[in-house]
Amino acid sequence: GMHGSDVIQTGWALARALGTIEGTELVIAGNESTDGVGGAVPAIIAEYLGLPQLTHLRKVSIEGGKITGERETDEGVFTLEATLPAVISVNEKINEPRFPSFKGIMAAKKKEVTVLTLAEIGVESDEVGLANAGSTVLASTPKPAKTAGEKVTDEGEGGNQIVQYLVAQKI
C-alpha cells in the first residue's frame, strides 16, 4: 500500500488517480497534510500531469479559461496566472472556515465515496510504500509546546508594558 510513501510516490499515485477523471479543469490542494508539511505534493502532481501549477495561494479567481492567484512571501505579494487546466495549492488565508450544519453533515454521510485501488489507477506495488521510498526520514523532532505567554495586568500602565515587550522582541 501507500504506507511510508515519500512525496514523490504520493504525488505519482495522486496524479495517476486524477488521470482517471475525464475533463478535470482544476485540482485544488492544501499546503499540508497530517503527516507532513513539505507543500511539494501539489507541484509534483502538476509535473506528472504536465499541467501548470500555482502554489501557496492566498487568493484565487477564474475568468475566461485563466486562473489568477496571489502568493504572499516575505518579499511581498506576487500575482500568478496560468491557463486551465491547472493545479493549485492554497494556504490558510484563502478563506474563513465555515462549519457545516447538522443537515449538511447528515447529507454528507449519505454521499458515496469512490475508493480506487493502486491497480485501478495503474500504480504497481513496487512503485510506492516505505520499502520503495526514494527518501528516508533520519530524525524528527516534535514541535515545542506552546507557552501561555506573558500576562500583563493593566493597572493603568498596561499599554506601556506591551510596547516595552514588543520593543524587546524587536516586533
Where are these regions (language model features)?
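N-terminal glycine-rich FAD/FM-binding segment characteristic of electron-transfer flavoproteins
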Residues: G1-I171
